[in-house]
Amino acid sequence: MIAITGGGTGGHLAIARCLLQSAKKQGLECIYIGSENGQDKLWFEQELAFHQRYFLSSSGVVNKKGLSKISSFMHIIKLALNVKKILKKHEVKAVFSVGGYSSAPASFAALMANIPLLIHEQNSKIGSLNLLLKPFSKAFFTAFDDQIDKKNTFFCPYPINEVFIQKARIRQELKSIIFLGGSQGAKFINDLALKNALYFKEKGINIIHQCGKSDYKRCKSAYESMQIKVDLFDFDKNIIEKISKADLAVSRSGASSLFELSANKLPCIFIPYPYAAKNHQYFNALYLKERNLCEILTQDRENDFIDIINNFPLKQISSRFCEIENKNGADFMLYKTKELGII
């Protein structure tokens, strides 16, 4: 039995799902430990492939200050003591953390129970919790080669659902554009899509738009007032079907988006969320930009958007993705864990 912990947002949860799928292929039973907050329950409350699912009252600590931060940390320790009992009950051999605030209780519980902790870091800048726990982990997995610094750190292909690879194709010309604000939506990207919708209509370019639940009504009303037919949705677990129809993406640059779009050979204009911790979304996108595999549009350069669209080397970038070998990162993590004699 292994435990998978972490989440909060879609990027972390997508990795958790990949690990679950790989574990089931290899005959490993899994439990999941996440949070009542964030999107953990939306993704996994009905996921029967897990032997058991636990959702705790955990929340973030990093953005809190003073006594509030101390109180939140003490609450995590209290939760960790309860999780320690859960790990012992299920005779868990290893705890895999995919990051996010909901991974904290189970990660600390693993250390308390002397159960091997294995961490996946999804971003180009290591998160605060992962940075704290890294020295105590048995293995630290990353898809960013500049994070390799110690013997327990392993370069690992980014865990993505294999369907992104299976449905990959070279984009030849811009017929459809998809706006992706992430699993929670992004008002800036929504506004950018609405502002330029008439331009795309005039050019005969179809719009696919993930706008998030909180902004759905506003976006729907705006498109209707412009009499523009658009594939508008708030959230879709099977988003690959939307992505596979698109020829160009406009997206935040969370790590999962970065690698999923790359695996699908879908060129992208990344708009990093400027308030992300350690500005990690910008550095995620920069990792691809330095390899001529994307364009970056910062929010203060909004007026450059159409120029970037008109001069975007669509076919060239899409073709370059063929040079990248796509392997199953979740399979690699489990293989390495077995090689280390942990499971």
Where are the regions a protein language model picked out?
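Nucleotide-activated donor-dependent transferases that construct or modify glycoconjugates
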Residues: M1-T9, A16
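Short amphipathic alpha-helix
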Residues: H12-A23
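Conserved nucleotide-sugar phosphate-binding/catalytic loop shared by glycosyltransferases and other
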Residues: I4-G7, K24-M74, D215, T298-D300
